[in-house]
From Swiss-Prot:
The lineage of its organism: Eukaryota, Metazoa, Ecdysozoa, Nematoda, Chromadorea. Keywords: DNA damage, DNA repair, DNA replication, DNA-binding, Nucleus. It comes from Caenorhabditis elegans. It is found in: Nucleus. Essential component of the RMI complex, a complex that plays an important role in the processing of homologous recombination intermediates. Component of the BTR double Holliday Junction dissolution complex, which is involved in homologous recombination during meiotic double strand break in the germline. Plays a role in double strand break repair by positively regulating the accumulation of rad-51 at double strand breaks. This is RecQ-mediated genome instability protein 2 homolog. Disruption phenotype: Embryonic lethality in 40% of animals, reduced brood size and high incidence of males phenotypes. Presence of a mix of univalent and bivalent chromosomes during diakinesis, impaired double strand breaks and chiasma formation and defective chromosome segregation. Delayed double break strand repair with an accumulation of rad-51-positive foci in early/mid pachynema in meiotic prophase I during meiotic recombination. GO terms for molecular function: DNA binding. Expressed in the germline. It comes from the Eukaryota. Component of the RMI complex, containing at least top-3, rmh-1 and rmh-2. Component of the BTR double Holliday Junction dissolution complex composed of at least him-6, top-3, rmh-1 and rmif-2, which is involved in double strand break repair in the germline. Interacts with rmh-1; the interaction is direct and is required for mutual stability and localization at nuclear foci. Belongs to the RMI2 family. Its main location: nucleus.
Length: 107
């Protein structure tokens, strides 16, 4: 199952896959931001995408313990940033309470 992070929590991630909803803060060096702060990627953005500073994307990252890779970008309308923040908050609450919102084995 792919995890969810924000710019503050991704800094402590070492392994696994995660998705972050964030704005492009800088292209060189690659940097993203959300309401928790900014995060400078340790890898380039996934290739094949046109982007401008201020664009909102869902960023998919893979961590293998020693490196990170941005494998996919999905552009989304800026109005969805608040919706994603609410979903992330609800997911974290469910995890804290020991509940799963989506089963990792669901088809």
């Amino acid at each position: 199952m792919c995890d969810r992070d924000d710019c503050a929590s991704i800094a402590s991630r070492c392994t696994g896959e995660t998705i972050i909803c964030a704005f492009v803060e800088s292209i060189t060096p690659p940097k993203i931001r959300d309401k928790t702060g900014t995060y400078e990627l340790k890898c380039p953005f996934a290739e094949g995408f046109t982007m401008e500073i201020g664009d909102l994307f869902l960023f998919h990252f893979v961590f293998d313990g020693s490196s990170e890779k941005c494998t996919r970008l999905t552009p989304i309308p800026k109005m969805l940033a608040m919706v994603y923040e609410k979903l992330l908050k609800d997911l974290r609450k469910a995890k804290k309470e020991g509940k799963m919102i989506i089963s990792p084995t669901a088809n």
